Curated annotation (Swiss-Prot):
<dbReference type="GO" id="GO:0005524">
    <property type="term" value="F:ATP binding"/>
</dbReference>
<comment type="similarity">
    <text>Belongs to the class-I aminoacyl-tRNA synthetase family.</text>
</comment>
<feature type="binding site">
    <location>
        <position position="635"/>
    </location>
    <ligand>
        <name>ATP</name>
    </ligand>
</feature>
<keyword id="KW-0030">Aminoacyl-tRNA synthetase</keyword>
<keyword id="KW-0648">Protein biosynthesis</keyword>
<dbReference type="InterPro" id="IPR004493">
    <property type="entry name" value="Leu-tRNA-synth_Ia_arc/euk"/>
</dbReference>
<dbReference type="GO" id="GO:0004823">
    <property type="term" value="F:leucine-tRNA ligase activity"/>
</dbReference>
<dbReference type="GO" id="GO:0005737">
    <property type="term" value="C:cytoplasm"/>
</dbReference>
<feature type="short sequence motif" description="'HIGH' region">
    <location>
        <begin position="41"/>
        <end position="51"/>
    </location>
</feature>
<dbReference type="InterPro" id="IPR002300">
    <property type="entry name" value="aa-tRNA-synth_Ia"/>
</dbReference>
<dbReference type="InterPro" id="IPR001412">
    <property type="entry name" value="aa-tRNA-synth_I_CS"/>
</dbReference>
<keyword id="KW-0547">Nucleotide-binding</keyword>
<dbReference type="Pfam" id="PF08264">
    <property type="entry name" value="Anticodon_1"/>
</dbReference>
<feature type="short sequence motif" description="'KMSKS' region">
    <location>
        <begin position="632"/>
        <end position="636"/>
    </location>
</feature>
<dbReference type="InterPro" id="IPR014729">
    <property type="entry name" value="Rossmann-like_a/b/a_fold"/>
</dbReference>
<keyword id="KW-0436">Ligase</keyword>
<dbReference type="GO" id="GO:0002161">
    <property type="term" value="F:aminoacyl-tRNA deacylase activity"/>
</dbReference>
Length: 966
C-alpha cells in the first residue's frame, strides 16, 4: 500500500478494473435477484449534490445486497423529454446573460462549448455524456449496457405501446380540466418545467356573484357557507379594475374584476371580452345584493386586498374572520366621504352563522379581544385566524340562519353548497394556485381550463382501488410515509398527459399531442430489460411492435405469432420474456421525497394498470433533500455543487461517505466544507490503520487464546455487524455508517489503547467488508493489499454471529472505561497531580440489592417501595436499613431509564469487580501516571475521606491522593 491515502489514484485504478472485469453487469442465474431502480436524472444541467445523495443511497443498497449473495441489477437511464431542455436551448441561443453565467460558472461548462449547446439535441448529447462520466467517477455499480435516453426511437416505441394499452382500458380520457399552464409556451407545465412554485397545487374556489344593477362583483372563497355572514365587500382603491363581458353556457353577464383576474378568466371555460376600465372609486360605497340571502351589503375600501388573488374583490365576514373584523373596526372613525360613504359603519351588525363549542356568538370579535390584537398589522391576527378557522372547520355546525343547511358540520358542507350555489347561479367555480407559479421560461403561469385535452383518469375509483391494494402489499421505507402515499392517492385527480411543445413521444392515437414528461417515466424500469438486447444489436426499431411488448412484458399472445410479425427468432423472444420474468417486479424503488406526490404515485398507478399483480413493485424508499451551506440548491439559479466537482475536490469515497452520514434518510442534509474535511481526516485514519495492520504481517485467529479485551472486541464487532445490516435493510445510511465506521473506529482505538493486538487482522477483515458499500474504492485497495484476488465488491458481507457475543466482556470494559473517565475528570476539575489512586468496589449488600431488583422486575414493573420492603426482609441486610432507601431511590430510576440490561448482566454473570479492576490496574496506572490500588468498600484498609461509602456496582468510589510538592 502507498504511504498516504491518495483517493484519486485509487479510484481511477478500481474504476478501470471494475469496467474491465464487468462485475456489475447482471444476467439471470440461479441466485435470488434484487432489482433496484432510482429515478433517472433530468438532463438540463450537470448532476448535483441532491442527485449524489439519492443515487449513492441506491448504490449502497445495491452493493450491500450484492455482497449478501443476491444477483443485483442496478441500471440507469436519462430523462430528457418535456420543455425544460427546449427552454434552455432557447436561452443559450439568445445568449441570456444569467443562463450563460450559471451554466459556465456553476455547472462548469467550458466557455468555448456552452454557446454551441443551442439546440435540445446538442444539450442532450452533452449532458448524457457528462452524467455518465460523473456517475462512473463516484463509483456507482451500474450496469451501463442498459442505458438509454427518453428520446431514443426505440424508447418512443415502448411509450407508444404503454399509452395505446392505457387508452384501450379507458384510463386516458379527453375533456376539460384545470391544469398548470404557461401562456408563453402555450403548454401545460409539470414540476420539471417550473422555476418557482413547484409545491403549488390547484385549489378550487367558489365565486359568489354579488350584484349591483347589471354588474356582477364576484368574490372567491374557500368557504361558501360564510356567504350567509357577509356584511360588506372589500375593494382596493389603488387597484385597476375592468368591466368584462363573461359568457358561459349561453349565459351572458358583466363582471367587474381586477386586471390580474381578467387575465386569469381568459384561460377558463368562459368566453371573456374586455369592455372598459372601471375606476376603483366607482365600485366603492355601492350597495350590492347578496345572491344567497338577498341582503344588501356595502362595498368598502381596503388596501390589503391583493389584485392577483381571486377576483381582486373580497367578501367580508367580520363575525367569523378576525381580519375582516379588524378591518371593519379600523374604519369606524375613518373619513370615507371621498367614496360617498357617510353612514356610521358601527351600525353594520355582525352576522353569526356557525355554532362553535369554544366560542360564543361572534368568534372573531371574541378572539381579537381576548388576544389583545390591536389592528390588522398585529402579527397575532394571523394566529387568531388560524385558531378560529381550525375550530370552526373541525367542530362548527351551521345555525338556523342558513335555512335547510342548519345542523350541517362545516367540514361537510362545502361541496353541497357549491353544487347548490352553481345550480341557482349564485356562484361559479374558479381555480387558483395555492402559491404563485413561474415557468422556467420566466412567465407567470395560470390555471387553464383546457378543452380537448388528454388526461390520465387518475380519479377513477377502480384504478385507485388497485393502487391502494398494491401499496398495502408493499414495504414503504420509512413506514411513516405510507400515510402520505395513501393521502396522495386519495387526493390525486385526473392529470393532463399531453402537451403541444417540447421533446417526447407523440400520442399514438392523436399525433398532434406529445406525451408529457412525467407521463413517459412511469414503467421504464421494464424497458431496462429490453434495452440490454437493443444494446447487443439483437433488437431493432422495426421489431418493437405492440404484440412484441404485449408478449415479452405481459405474456399475452405467443412467441410464434410475434416471430412471424417481427422476423425475430422465437428463441430470442422467449429469452427476453424469461429475462423479464426473472428481474420483475422491481424490488426497490428509491427516490427523493419531492417525487412522492407525482412520479412515485404515477409509478404505482401505471404498474397496476398494465401488469399482473405478481409484477407489481415490492418496495418504495424515500430520502430527503440536500442544501449547500444552508442554502437551497437550484440548477437554474445556483448555488449548486455538482457531483463531478465534489468528486474532483474530495474524492469519490469521501464524497459518498459524507453525503450519507450528514443526515438520516428522510431528513434534509446540508453539505458543509468543514464536515467533509472532517470526513477526510477520518478516512485517513482508517487507511493508516489498515496499512499498519497489513504491514505488521500478524494474522491472529479466533482459535488463539483470547484475553478479555479480545473477547470484548469480538463482541463489539458482532454488534456493529448486526446494527449495520439492520440499518442498511431499513436504508438508514447514517445509522449504518455510524456503526460500521465512526463507533467502530473508536472501539478499535480503545482496543489498541488497552494493548489489544491479536485480533487486529480479524477486525480489519470484517471492517473493510462492512465499509465496502460506502467507500468501495478504498476497500478494494485494502482488500487487495490483504492478499485477496477477488474484489471485495463480490465478497461475503459480514453476518452476525451471536455465539461471539460476550456481555460480560463488554460490561467489564465499560466499567474500566467509565472508571478511567471518572478519574481523569476528577483530576481535570481539581487540577491536582495524583500521587496515588484508590478504587473502592461496591459492598456486597449493594450487589445483592441489584440482584434482587433484577429478580423483581421479571415479575412486575420495579417500584421503590417493593424493592425496599424486599431488601429489609432479609436478615443479613437489616443493619443497612438507613442506607437501603437512598440506594434504592437512586437505582430504580436507572432501571426504568435503560440501565436494567447492564445490571442484569452484572447480576447473572456474577462479575467480580475487584478482580476486574486488579487485572486492569496496570493499564490504569499507565494512563493516569501513578499507582492504583484496589480495595473493597466492605473492608477498606485505607480510606481517609470515607469515599468507600459511595461505591456502587459498576461504579467504584475514587480517592485520589495528591502529590505533595517537594
Amino acid at each position: 500500500m502507498e504511504q498516504d491515502y491518495k483517493p484519486h489514484e485509487i479510484e481511477n485504478k478500481w474504476q478501470k478494473k471494475w469496467n474491465e472485469s464487468r462485475i456489475f453487469q447482471a444476467e439471470p442465474d440461479k441466485r435470488e435477484k434484487f432489482f433496484i431502480t432510482i429515478p433517472y436524472p433530468y438532463l438540463n444541467g450537470n448532476l448535483h449534490a441532491g442527485h449524489t445523495r439519492t443515487f449513492t443511497i441506491g448504490d449502497v443498497v445495491a452493493r450491500h445486497k450484492r455482497m449478501l449473495g443476491y444477483n443485483v441489477l442496478y441500471p440507469m437511464g436519462f430523462h430528457v423529454t418535456g420543455t425544460p431542455i427546449v427552454g434552455l436551448a432557447e436561452l443559450i441561443a439568445s445568449r441570456d446573460p444569467q443562463t450563460m453565467d450559471v451554466y459556465e460558472r456553476l455547472h462548469g461548462i467550458p466557455g468555448d462549448i456552452l454557446p454551441a449547446l443551442d439546440t435540445p439535441e446538442k444539450i442532450v448529447d452533452y449532458f448524457k455524456v457528462e452524467a455518465e462520466k460523473a456517475m462512473r467517477m463516484i463509483g456507482y455499480s451500474i450496469d451501463w449496457r442498459r442505458k438509454f435516453t427518453t428520446t431514443d426511437p426505440t424508447y418512443k416505441k415502448f411509450i407508444e405501446w404503454q399509452y395505446t394499452r392505457l387508452e384501450e382500458k379507458d384510463l386516458i380520457v379527453k375533456g376539460s380540466h384545470p391544469v398548470k399552464w404557461c401562456p408563453n409556451d402555450n403548454n401545460p407545465v409539470e414540476d420539471h418545467d417550473i422555476l418557482h412554485g413547484e409545491e403549488a397545487t390547484i385549489v378550487e374556489y367558489t365565486l359568489i356573484k354579488f350584484r349591483y344593477r347589471d354588474l356582477v362583483l364576484p368574490c372567491a372563497t374557500l368557504r361558501p357557507e360564510t356567504t350567509y355572514g357577509v356584511t360588506n365587500l372589500w375593494v382596493n382603491p389603488n387597484v385597476d379594475y375592468v368591466k368584462a363581458r363573461v359568457e358561459k353556457d349561453g349565459n351572458v353577464e358583466f363582471w367587474v374584476v381586477s386586471r390580474d383576474a381578467f387575465r386569469k378568466l381568459t384561460f377558463t371555460d368562459r368566453t371573456v371580452e374586455y369592455v372598459e376600465d372601471m375606476p376603483a372609486k366607482s365600485i366603492i360605497g355601492i350597495k350590492l345584493t347578496n345572491p344567497v340571502t338577498g341582503d344588501e351589503v356595502i362595498s368598502l375600501p381596503a388596501s390589503f386586498v391583493k389584485p392577483e388573488n381571486g377576483s381582486g374583490i373580497v367578501m367580508s365576514v367580520p363575525a367569523h374572520a378576525p381580519f375582516d373584523y379588524l378591518a371593519l373596526r379600523d374604519l369606524y372613525d375613518a373619513d370615507l366621504s371621498e367614496y360617498g360613504i357617510t353612514e356610521d359603519l358601527r351600525k353594520i351588525e355582525l352576522i353569526s352563522l356557525i355554532q362553535v363549542p369554544e366560542f360564543g356568538e361572534f368568534p372573531a370579535k371574541e378572539i381579537v379581544e381576548s388576544m389583545g390584537i390591536s389592528d390588522q398589522k398585529d402579527p397575532k391576527a394571523e394566529e387568531a385566524t388560524k385558531i378560529v378557522y381550525r375550530r370552526e372547520f373541525h367542530g362548527g355546525v351551521l345555525k338556523e340562519l342558513t335555512g335547510k343547511y342548519k345542523g350541517y358540520p362545516v367540514s361537510k358542507i362545502k361541496d353541497i353548497l357549491t353544487r347548490d350555489f352553481l345550480a341557482s347561479n349564485a356562484g361559479e367555480t374558479f381555480y387558483e394556485f395555492s402559491e404563485p407559479v413561474v415557468c422556467r421560461c420566466g412567465t407567470p403561469c395560470v390555471v387553464n381550463m383546457v378543452k380537448g385535452q388528454w388526461f390520465l383518469n387518475y380519479s377513477n375509483p377502480d384504478w385507485k382501488a388497485k393502487v391502494y391494494k398494491c401499496l398495502g402489499q408493499m414495504r414503504v421505507i420509512p413506514t411513516e410515509y405510507r400515510v402520505e402515499f395513501e393521502n396522495k392517492i386519495d387526493w390525486l385527480k385526473d392529470k393532463a398527459c399531453a402537451r403541444r411543445k417540447g421533446l417526447g413521444t407523440r400520442l399514438p392515437f392523436d399525433k398532434e399531442w406529445l406525451i408529457e414528461s412525467l407521463g413517459d417515466s412511469t414503467i421504464y424500469m421494464s424497458y431496462y430489460i429490453i434495452a440490454r438486447f437493443i444494446e447487443k444489436g439483437e433488437l431493432a426499431l422495426e421489431h418493437l411492435t405492440l404484440s412484441f411488448f404485449d408478449y415479452v412484458l405481459l405474456g399475452k399472445g405467443d412467441s410464434a405469432a410475434v416471430s412471424a410479425e417481427t422476423g425475430l427468432k422465437p428463441e430470442l423472444i422467449e429469452e427476453i420474456r424469461s429475462h423479464f420474468n426473472y428481474w420483475y417486479p422491481v424490488d426497490l424503488r428509491s427516490s427523493g421525497k419531492d417525487l412522492v406526490p407525482n412520479h412515485l404515485l404515477f409509478f404505482l398507478f401505471h404498474h397496476v394498470a398494465l401488469f399482473e399483480e405478481e409484477k407489481w413493485p415490492k418496495a418504495l424508499a424515500v430520502n430527503g433533500f440536500v442544501s449547500l451551506e444552508g442554502q437551497k440548491m437550484s440548477k437554474s439559479k445556483g448555488p449548486i455543487l455538482t457531483l463531478e466537482s465534489a468528486v474532483s475536490s474530495y474524492g469519490a469515497d469521501i464524497t459518498r461517505m459524507y453525503i450519507l452520514s450528514t443526515a438520516e434518510q428522510t431528513q434534509d442534509a446540508d453539505w458543509q466544507k468543514a464536515g467533509i474535511d472532517s470526513a477526510r481526516r477520518q478516512v485517513d485514519r482508517f487507511y493508516a490503520f489498515a496499512k499498519d495492520v497489513i504491514e505488521s504481517g500478524k494474522r491472529g485467529t479466533l482459535s488463539a487464546e483470547l484475553k478479555q479485551i479480545d473477547r470484548w472486541m469480538l463482541s463489539r464487532m458482532q454488534n456493529y455487524i448486526k446494527e449495520t445490516n439492520a440499518a442498511l435493510d431499513s436504508i438508514q445510511t447514517r445509522e449504518a455508517i455510524q456503526n460500521s465506521f465512526f463507533l467502530l473506529i473508536n472501539d478499535v482505538r480503545w482496543y489498541q489503547r488497552r494493548g489489544g493486538e491479536a485480533l487486529l487482522y480479524y477486525v480489519l477483515d470484517n471492517w473493510v467488508r462492512l465499509m465496502a458499500p460506502f467507500t468501495p474504492h478504498l476497500c478494494e485497495e485494502v482488500w487487495e493489499a490483504m492478499g485477496h484476488e477477488d474484489p471485495v465488491s463480490l465478497a461475503q458481507y459480514p453476518l452476525y454471529n451471536e455465539d461471539l457475543i460476550d456481555n460480560g466482556a463488554e460490561l467489564s470494559e465499560e466499567a474500566v472505561k467509565s472508571t478511567l473517565n471518572d478519574i481523569e475528570e476528577i483530576i481535570r476539575v481539581t487540577k491536582m497531580t495524583p500521587q496515588k489512586v484508590y478504587l473502592y468496589t461496591a459492598p456486597a449488600w449493594k450487589a445483592e440489592a441489584i440482584r434482587c431488583a433484577c429478580g423483581l422486575q421479571v415479575e412486575a414493573p420495579l417500584e421503590v417501595g417493593t424493592l425496599i420492603k424486599t431488601l429489609m426482609a432479609k436478615p443479613e441486610l437489616k443493619r443497612f436499613g438507613k442506607e437501603i432507601p437512598k440506594f434504592v431511590q437512586k437505582i430504580v430510576p436507572e432501571f426504568k431509564s435503560g440501565g436494567a440490561e447492564r445490571y442484569e448482566t452484572f447480576a447473572y454473570l456474577g462479575l467480580d469487580e475487584k478482580d476486574l479492576l486488579k487485572e486492569s490496574a496496570s493499564f490504569l496506572e499507565k494512563e493516569i501516571g501513578c499507582p492504583v490500588e484496589i480495595q473493597s468498600a466492605d473492608s477498606p484498609e485505607y480510606d481517609p475521606q470515607k469515599k468507600s461509602r459511595f461505591a456502587e456496582p459498576l461504579r467504584p468510589a475514587i480517592y485520589i491522593e495528591e502529590k505533595k510538592e517537594e
